[in-house]
């Protein structure tokens, strides 16, 4: 829809590396991509939750070349920080709240 109206898009990398990987992949495939926006480079927990962290170089994200979204979840880390309906589960600090 945006492309047909000559509008550019700027996906936000705000919800962790799996959502970010989806936005990175779509950004490499569309002609009206402008910029990826992120508040960080997915260090700490967001790097640990992937078997191979997303790479950044000079402020640019390097699109993964592995199949699918290009990322593989580290299930041990994910299970150690399992979601529960009582606590906020966002990374805006060193470790997610759980």
Where are these regions (language model features)?
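Extended hydrophobic packing segments that form well-structured cores
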Residues: 69-98
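Shared catalytic-loop signature of beta/alpha-barrel
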Residues: 1-68, 72
């Amino acid at each position: 829809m945006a492309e047909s109206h000559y509008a550019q898009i700027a996906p936000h990398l705000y919800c962790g590396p799996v959502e970010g990987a989806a936005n990175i992949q779509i950004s490499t495939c569309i002609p009206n991509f402008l910029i990826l926006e992120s508040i960080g480079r997915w260090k700490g927990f967001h790097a640990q939750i992937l078997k191979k962290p997303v790479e950044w170089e000079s402020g640019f994200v390097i699109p993964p070349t592995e199949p699918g979204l290009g990322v593989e979840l580290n299930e041990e880390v994910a299970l150690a920080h399992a979601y529960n309906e009582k606590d906020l589960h966002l990374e805006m600090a060193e470790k997610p709240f759980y």
